[in-house]
A protein has these predicted regions:
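Short, glycine-/aromatic-enriched active-site segment of Class I SAM-dependent methyltransferases
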Residues: 182-199
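S-adenosyl-L-methionine
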Residues: 108-161
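A basic, amphipathic helix-loop patch mediating RNA/tRNA/ribosome contacts
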Residues: 1-50, 84-85
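Flexible, glycine-/basic-rich loop-and-beta segments that form/coincide
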Residues: 236, 240-267
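Conserved class I S-adenosyl-L-methionine
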Residues: 81-91
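A short glycine-rich, Lys/Arg-flanked "PGG" loop and its adjoining helix->strand segment in the class I
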Residues: 160-177
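Conserved S-adenosyl-L-methionine
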Residues: 98-106
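Glycine-rich SAM-binding Motif I of class I
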Residues: 93-94, 115
Length: 267
């Protein structure tokens, strides 16, 4: 198996750009560097774990994913000061980076893939890099502790395979933010061309099912909104904020779900 990938593809895979076209534009503009060397050809094959930087990049995190967690932190009472966290589906580490910048003291960065976590996070002693690790096999004993906070951003797997494990890793006083991705939750017949779900009724069905499933896992809804950025294929995604406390939890109603979906489609 090759350990190299086209530069434009790698930049998208790392969440630095939402499309190959935008990645290519940045490459042609001379904005992409591997270590201190500028790379100006989109087709250049580079190591999948290369240290890539974007000159003039205004993104505050190692990937766009950090903006998703940032929104949740801004609108919900999430205090990560000195928190121990699990980042499920860490990938490049956007959520991990955001959490660290907001005070987290330790992050278990878990992903079934490998050679994806950003170089700066690999070097950060606060980050425990758990690559090649299927979350469904992770136990509290493996971590050595229960955690204060969990973030979930997974692909090609439903949250109904992840939430039951996540709740076993979380303290009773902890909280969890999950990215709900309709393209991986809806049946294949409801996913459109290019893997995009545009039907708001499908969005509502997915949210209803996942929120009820979380409730059955004793993860109670305390906030629901839409992601501030779309997925790489242009999919609308949603953010659920949960705790293990049923006190002041939101009721999972059609009105709540419809309002959030309508707002997401209005953008």
């Amino acid at each position: 198996m090759s350990n190299k990938e086209r530069l434009d593809i790698l930049l998208v895979n790392r969440g630095l750009f939402e499309s190959r076209e935008k990645a290519k534009a940045a490459i042609m503009a001379g904005q992409i560097f591997m270590d201190t060397t500028r790379i100006d050809k989109a087709g250049t094959k580079v190591p999948v774990d290369a240290n890539l930087t974007v000159k003039g990049n205004t993104l505050p995190y190692v990937s766009r994913g950090g903006l998703k967690l940032e929104k949740a932190i801004q609108i919900y009472p999430i205090d990560l000061t000195d928190a121990v966290m699990v980042d499920i589906g860490a990938s490049t580490g956007g959520f991990t980076d955001c959490a660290l910048q907001n005070g987290a003291s330790k992050v278990f960065a878990i992903d079934v893939g490998y050679n994806q976590l950003a170089w700066k996070l690999r070097q950060d002693e606060r980050v425990i890099n758990m690559e090649k690790q299927n979350i469904r096999t992770v136990t509290p004993e493996q971590l050595g502790e229960l955690v204060d906070f969990i973030s979930i951003d997974v692909a090609f797997i439903s949250l109904d395979k992840v939430l039951p494990v996540a709740t076993t890793l979380l303290k009773d006083t902890g909280s969890l933010v999950a990215l709900i991705k309709p393209q991986f939750e809806a049946g294949k017949e409801k996913v459109g061309k290019g893997g995009i779900v545009r039907d708001r009724l499908v969005h509502e069905e997915v949210l209803q099912r996942i929120l009820q499933f979380a409730y059955d896992c004793r993860l109670y809804l305390h906030g629901l909104t839409f992601s501030p950025i779309k997925g790489t294929e242009g999919n609308i995604e949603f953010l659920g904020y949960f705790t293990k406390s049923e006190d002041d939890a939101l009721s999972i109603t059609d009105e709540l779900i419809t309002a959030v979906v309508d707002e997401s489609h209005a953008l």
